[in-house]
């Protein structure tokens, strides 16, 4: 017998839960369109090597990977950025820079399912390709902030930021290979600090990395101390610009009234980040609800010209989880049920329904075969605001009988007055 449950790690959505998801998506779409971003859609199925090239074979265990009927190894996309870069290289290189793109769709990861983590989930994100200056960092952060302001969450969230370039440049000084660097950062991301540090040779730079990773809330005192050490103790003046850049971003976020902090031990799980990285946190959940960063080398890694880029992805379902109570996010819906009491009135009733829908009212014709005494409470329970009764008399007189399910008031009015009457009472 077929199971009625969705496949493990997948989830059905309906009602209020789905409504909140749509609220998040609509807020995202509103802001990114106003910011001048263009929509792009890419396939769910991609060549596995698109993701493995930078992430390595260890990605295989967390992805849906399979061979198609032609024997090609393909995967369900675990994220969007590699697909966007592939599309850019295939179709958009000729356009003037920077290029602003947005996407919205499902991604797939073979993780262990738990609260807030499913194997299929939605991501809404943007990518800005062709700019490396700090203004592009600010543009991305500003758009992210505006989306959460639109969702009335700006005073609840906290933005965690870092510049991964600091750690990468020190690892380069230690002559750590790219593959070992990714493994090191992967361990840091999983909280396995000691195991990660054990991979490094004994060196003063290893000591520096240890010290930097321990700074989880950079203040002016620790900022000045690290700058002094980079200059006088380690002779790494070229790293100061990376430290200054993240500190400048933090100061700007402060001036914008955004709750943010710099965690120098923060790294993100994706292997391609090269500069600014960030995550959005909310106190009601233990996981991030959005994140992103700069990936200046990914286009070149895929065989294209050196092209700086930055972007973010919002976890749509995760953000929906932390929305306020339904009445603060739910659009006012005035659902109207139309009850046809006479067969000869059906065409008249259809015309009424069409008029209501054309004026943005939710209207349905009754299909329930139950008595009027049971019909009225059933519609009230389903969230309807009004019922319209249309019988032989209403059809002949071109009137409708309207019942307000909140006040219990019932009136009979002319058809041509219906819309004006509804505007007065809603």
Swiss-Prot record:
Single annotated GO MF: histidine-tRNA ligase activity
Primary location group: cytoplasm
GO biological process annotation, one example: L-histidine biosynthetic process
Keyword Nucleotide-binding carried by entry: yes
Keyword Protein biosynthesis: yes
Entry keywords, A to Z: Aminoacyl-tRNA synthetase, ATP-binding, Cytoplasm, Ligase, Nucleotide-binding, Protein biosynthesis
A Pfam short name: HGTP_anticodon
Catalytic class of the enzyme: ligase
Catalytic activity from the UniProt record: tRNA(His) + L-histidine + ATP = L-histidyl-tRNA(His) + AMP + diphosphate + H(+)
Cellular compartment(s): Cytoplasm
EC number(s) per entry: 6.1.1.21
CC per GO annotation: cytoplasm
Transmembrane segment boundaries: none
Family according to the record: Belongs to the class-II aminoacyl-tRNA synthetase family.
Name recorded for this polypeptide: Histidine--tRNA ligase
Organism: Sulfurisphaera tokodaii (strain DSM 16993 / JCM 10545 / NBRC 100140 / 7) (Sulfolobus tokodaii)
Annotated gene: hisS
